[in-house]
UniProtKB/Swiss-Prot annotation:
PANTHER family: DNA-DIRECTED RNA POLYMERASE, DNA-DIRECTED RNA POLYMERASE SUBUNIT BETA. Its cofactor is Mg(2+); Zn(2+). It is found in: Plastid, Chloroplast. Keywords: Chloroplast, DNA-directed RNA polymerase, Magnesium, Metal-binding, Nucleotidyltransferase, Plastid, Transcription, Transferase, Zinc. GO terms for cellular component: chloroplast; DNA-directed RNA polymerase complex; mitochondrion. This is DNA-directed RNA polymerase subunit beta'. Mg(2+) binds at D489, D491, D493. The gene is rpoC1. It is an enzyme of class 2 (transferase). It catalyses: RNA(n) + a ribonucleoside 5'-triphosphate = RNA(n+1) + diphosphate. Belongs to the RNA polymerase beta' chain family. RpoC1 subfamily.
Length: 682
């Protein structure tokens, strides 16, 4: 439906029999009302045409071919001069055949039938509203027992005996056997109530506002009593309070949505449009039919049998009528939700029938597969892998996916640059993967963001915008810091790619949806792009070396290493000391690491511009060295000071590793970039 703000939305709920009748009934130009499906047939075996008043009737659901009736006559659709608007012989209107996708029919049930979703699904809505055990209501629905009608004025047979539910239950095999159909109907209408009709009467007598008042009052009284000290009684009171809360919420929902409780019992059963339950002809002339058609046929067969028992036959025992009502209830249950009451119904090949619930629920159901997860143009899907060299707002898009997503833009670029004369030539160049195609593709992608989505999209960070770049392979490369927002892992997860086409969508993607603009959780405001898993392990490896200072590394015999950071035998080199290398700047240290002269965690001395105020004055040097040029080296735990003869500081070296240098440079570049961005913004 469409609300007042012109937003399309879908709402599922109970409807009244009058609303079902308004949806399904239609008045033909001759005044005839059609819409009721009375025959369990589909197509005639000789003519292959839909049977009249059957499950595919053209009078009820519309013509199979646009503007052509069942007789074969043709009229122009929408031409007001064409008269009449329907075929007087077969009663089929001359309308578009697409009407068979939304025009419904109905089955008029011979007895009320309880909707199994409201009865058997947990929590049971009917049991909550009536405040009765579910097992007792099931016995009433499936005619296992009856209850006496509350007649105040007239003294009835059962009231004179003072009988109630469980006494009548013992009579359920005796009373119907001595009564015919007509006599049993008279007796039942006066004395007892059973089946879904009894549930309907109980629901119709409910006053939802009184339920709200009494339930709230009882909950308040239970809360004032407090704990009794008996664990069993306290649990019982707690369960009762939870039940009252559910009952109040359910009653409020019914009042708010203007739904009457008795609508949970069906008198008219809607029949889906034929295009949603098709019969398809395959090779060899065989027909494949939807399981729902077979379930509808079963309902119609049993309903017609019950109608005959109630109207035509006068000598049928009442027990047979009750049994047939139970069969109708079970047939409708199977149509709505096969297997909800136990063993599911199967066909001749021992295959379970797919009921209405199976068609709409789950990942392959109508909503998630066709409406929410349907395939759209300008979209793709692939596995995600980590791209540590990418920027936070970039993602790597495989060439195979990129050329398909941006094919129309590439074709326009080829034609504009006079590299192709028409669309066909441009597509040929794309199929042959000429080098010029990749150049134009990169130009197109440079100014066009893409959207990445990972299902299920539970919050707004489940879909974010990125600037794509071409990568080799068939997997989408993603920066590891954006993983948490998508709740994804690099263990085979897949993501969908979408291309925003309109200028409004592209502007929204750039201004609101880019990944570097969604660093905080929208729920609690905490940072969501934080290092985890592999990144933490990498940072640990970078900074794990040289953790215990110079003393532990130099004088521990198990830590003796050469200049290549290789372990040496401490006993064989007892008098040999390996000097740690000195570097004037970080570039020399990184160069030595790339030349494999040192390892990532090898300790080294790096010349550093360190403020003398940061040096602790009370710290005593571990040892001192005198150089040949008169310099004096004071060695501390994590730094070294070089002084001249006059005790003046010439330089300061810090003891570090290549991993620490890499981490420091990354942090320094990030801070400089942030400061530059702030200065550009001001």
């Amino acid at each position: 439906m469409i609300d007042r703000y012109k937003h399309q939305q879908l709402r599922i709920g109970s409807v009244s029999p009058q609303q079902i009748s308004a949806w399904t009934n239609k008045i033909l130009p001759n005044g005839e009302i059609v819409g009721e499906v009375t025959k369990p047939y589909t197509f005639h075996y000789k003519t292959n045409k839909p049977e009249k008043d059957g499950l595919f009737c053209e009078r009820i659901f519309g013509p199979i071919k646009s503007g052509i009736c069942a007789c074969g006559n043709y009229r122009v659709i929408g031409d007001e001069k064409e008269e009449p608007k329907f075929c007087e012989q077969c009663g089929v209107e001359f309308v578009d055949s697409r009407i068979r996708r939304y025009q419904m029919g109905y089955i008029k049930l011979a007895c009320p039938v309880t909707h199994v979703w409201y009865l058997k699904r947990l929590p049971s809505y009917i049991a909550n509203l009536l405040d009765k055990p579910l097992k007792q209501l099931e016995g009433l629905v499936y005619c296992d027992f009856s209850f006496a009608r509350p007649i105040a004025k007239k003294p009835t047979f059962l009231r004179l005996r003072g009988s109630f539910e469980y006494e009548i239950q013992s009579w359920k095999y005796s009373i119907p056997l001595f009564l015919t159909t007509q006599g049993f109907d008279t007796f039942r209408n006066r004395e007892i109530s059973t089946g879904a009709g009894a549930i309907r009467e109980l629901l119709a007598d409910l006053d939802l506002r009184i339920i709200l008042d009494y339930s709230s009052l009882e909950w308040k009284e239970l809360g004032e009593e407090g704990p009794t000290g008996n664990e069993w009684e306290d649990r019982k009171v707690g369960r009762r309070k939870d039940f009252l809360v559910r009952r109040v919420e359910l009653a409020k929902h019914f009042i708010r949505t203007n739904i009457e409780p008795e609508w949970m019992v069906l008198c008219l059963l809607p029949v889906l449009p034929p295009e949603l339950r098709p019969i398809i002809q395959i090779d060899g002339g065989k027909l494949m039919s939807s399981d729902i058609n077979e379930l509808y046929r079963r309902v119609i067969y049993r309903n017609n049998t019950l109608t005959d028992l109630l109207t035509t036959s006068r000598s049928t025992p009442g027990e047979l009528v009750m049994c047939q009502e139970k069969l109708v209830q079970e047939a409708v249950d199977t149509l709505l939700d096969n297997g909800i009451r136990g063993q599911p119904m199967r066909d001749g090949h021992n295959k379970v029938y797919k009921s209405f619930s199976d068609v709409i629920e789950g990942k392959e159901g109508r909503f998630r597969e066709t409406m929410l997860g349907k395939r759209v143009d300008y979209s793709g899907r692939s596995v995600i892998v980590v791209g540590p060299s990418l920027s936070l707002h970039r993602c790597g898009l495989p060439r195979e996916i990129a050329i398909e997503l941006f094919q129309t833009f590439v074709i326009r670029g080829l034609i504009r640059q006079h590299l192709a004369s028409n669309i066909g030539v441009a597509k040929s160049k794309i199929r042959e993967k000429e080098p010029i195609v990749w150049g134009i593709l990169q130009e197109v992608m440079r100014g066009h963001p893409i959207l990445l989505n990972r299902a299920p999209t539970l919050h707004r960070l489940g879909i974010q915008a990125f600037q794509p770049i071409l990568v080799e392979g068939r997997a989408i490369c993603l920066h590891p810091l954006v993983r948490k927002g998508f709740n994804a892992d690099f263990d085979g997860d897949q993501m969908a790619v979408h291309v925003p086409l309109s200028l409004e969508a592209q502007a929204e993607a750039r201004l609101l949806m880019f990944s570097h603009m969604n660093l905080l959780s929208p729920a609690i405001g905490d940072p969501i792009s934080v290092p985890t898993q592999d990144m933490l392990m990498g940072l640990y490896v970078l900074t794990s070396g040289n953790r215990r200072g110079i003393c532990a590394n130099r004088y521990n015999p198990f830590n003796c290493r050469n200049f290549q950071n290789e372990k040496i035998d401490a006993n064989a080199n007892k008098d040999k000391y390996i000097k740690e290398p000195f570097f004037c700047n970080s570039y020399d240290a990184i160069g030595a690491y790339r030349q494999k002269r040192i390892n990532l965690e090898s300790p080294l001395w790096l010349r550093w511009q360190l403020d003398q105020g940061l040096i602790a004055s009370r710290e005593a040097p571990i040892e001192g060295h005198f150089g040949s040029l008169g310099t004096y080296h004071e060695i501390y735990g994590h730094y070294l000071i070089v002084r001249n003869i006059k005790k003046k500081i010439l330089s300061i070296y810090i003891r570090t590793t290549v991993g620490h240098i890499y981490l420091y440079r990354e942090i320094e570049e990030a801070i400089q970039g942030f400061c530059q961005a702030c200065s550009d913004g001001t």
